[in-house]
């Protein structure tokens, strides 16, 4: 199996994101290896030796996705027996030409702490934890969004991801079997209808998830899951609540779709 390296003098997050996004376009499996904080020439030479050894072992050149602000480190890694992709140089040169402004290299700039956005995210994470699964309904006035759905439909991980990644205060509320016996929304949610966003899920997937939690129970039965999913989707439609199916989407995709559909403000930068 061919190896793909993601290397940087910072966190290597940018290299990973660009690299994985690019490789995902090809139906080929890779052995992925991430190496962050390559900040000295000595360390760069060590990594070069590792890359060369990997090429010899695999019988083919590794793919190297890297981001360095230090040109000397770029030169060292680029001289390895590998196919190299330098994202920063590729794009910064074009942008420099367009803006007529020279870039100012700074290590860790991309994923360093920006005080304002950091505070937003910490506050949002604390809010999501305190308002998980219907807790602290009295705080819903502070919410940017309130996710609703049947149990185990993806509300909690999505709430936390929205908070941690984007600084969005996301509460979540479970729609129970009792709630579904009426045609209306739970009374506590009515004042915040404009903040509601629903999640649904395929019954078969829901049953599998619930079975890991409470095996052989009514709660995890496919019949119960089908009833709950059908009823909650009818609830969404009756009350004109936007919703999406989380079955085949990652938490990143779900969150991005929610932000796109609701025009929520990202507080990432």
Curated annotation (Swiss-Prot):
NCBIfam families: PRK05339.1. ADP binds at residues 149-156. InterPro entries: Kinase-pyrophosphorylase, PSRP. GO terms for molecular function: ADP binding; ATP binding; phosphotransferase activity, phosphate group as acceptor; protein serine/threonine kinase activity. Its EC number is 2.7.11.33, 2.7.4.28. It catalyses: [pyruvate, water dikinase] + ADP = [pyruvate, water dikinase]-phosphate + AMP + H(+); [pyruvate, water dikinase]-phosphate + phosphate + H(+) = [pyruvate, water dikinase] + diphosphate. PANTHER family: PYRUVATE, PHOSPHATE DIKINASE REGULATORY PROTEIN 1, CHLOROPLASTIC. This is Putative phosphoenolpyruvate synthase regulatory protein. Belongs to the pyruvate, phosphate/water dikinase regulatory protein family. PSRP subfamily. The keyword Plastid does not apply. It is an enzyme of class 2 (transferase).
